[in-house]
Amino acid sequence: MAARRALGGLILLRNIMPVNQIEITSCGKRLLVPCAEIEGRTVIVTGRCVKIASIRDAIVAEGELVKNPGTFVPALKRSGLKADVLAFFQRPPDVTPKFKHHFEWDNYAAVDCANFDAWWEKLPQEARKNTRRSAKRGVTVKVVSFDDALAREIHQLCDESPMRQGKPFWHYGKDFETVKREHSTYLERSEFIGAYFENRLIGFIKVVYVDRIAFIFHILAFNAHYDKRPLNALITETVKICSQRGVKYLVYDKYVYGNKKESTLVEFKRRNGFEQIDFPAYYIPLTWKGKIFVALRLYRGAVGLLPAPVLKLGLKLRDRFYRARRKPAETKEV
């Protein structure tokens, strides 16, 4: 009997695949997380109280992320990964829900690149003026290769200000090698478009091509050159390049973030011709804890659960907090 139990234990161990660890970047920080290979995908687990299993670097993974949940979920459970929920999504343009599992509509901010001229004509007059103004003020925009010279210019750009969009900027204060490494991912599928003034980089966009979509990974410009509107010129050139390459969509992260419907970033995207495209995001519970998590829709996070007025107040308080922190630092510098 003891031998049979021992043999059963060995069989059980053989059925569980080894769990490894892999490094990921989250909010500008490098973390080690558990991972396993499942049906050709690297699955990682993140979270503390509730463990979320997801496809590593899902945004740049080509093809369907999960072809068949009916086989993927059992394989995940056998993998040895301790997860409460499996989360994945369907990438546009295929947005008709395929699976009979719990899902919610997520969204992208996207430009339809099929016809550059049609996109240009639909832009608000002010956006077209800003692009022309950029050229008149001496800004040139071109595709550039990623090398040490470009990485140094990007490093200088990252160090212009510790704050971006009212909050601490992730890349500020990092050393050159770190900035170079973090901007050199997926180079075989990437393109860098730079905006130059008097032969100096004043802004850039990095896009990564995934199937028929181009994702904006980085977009940044010197605040000191805002009057030259480099970002408008960069977006226009990027849409033109995508149209020439036969790319369906240029995507700039989300259009709206949960109940945060209004912000300067949302307004910037709207003025530059980005529109909201919805797609299904699936959340499949794997444990009793996962069932509660999904039933209460806690995956939405604070931005998706708190009412808009509360979020607006919270953002105002956050801005005041960061401004108060900056004043002592500025006083010391003076």
Give residue spans per PLM region:
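Active-site/acyl-donor-binding loops of N-acyltransferases
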Residues: 18-51, 55, 99-118, 248-334
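N-terminal accessory interaction module
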Residues: 31-89
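N-terminal amphipathic/hydrophobic targeting modules at extreme N-termini
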Residues: 2-3, 7-9
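A conserved beta-strand-loop-helix scaffold within acyl/acetyltransferase catalytic domains
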Residues: 13-53, 94-96, 120-226
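Acyl-donor-binding surface of acyltransferase catalytic domains
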Residues: 12, 65-147
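Aromatic (often tryptophan-rich) hydrophobic motifs at membrane interfaces
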Residues: 74, 185-294
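Amphipathic, soluble alpha/beta structural segments
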Residues: 155-184, 246-247, 258, 262-271, ...
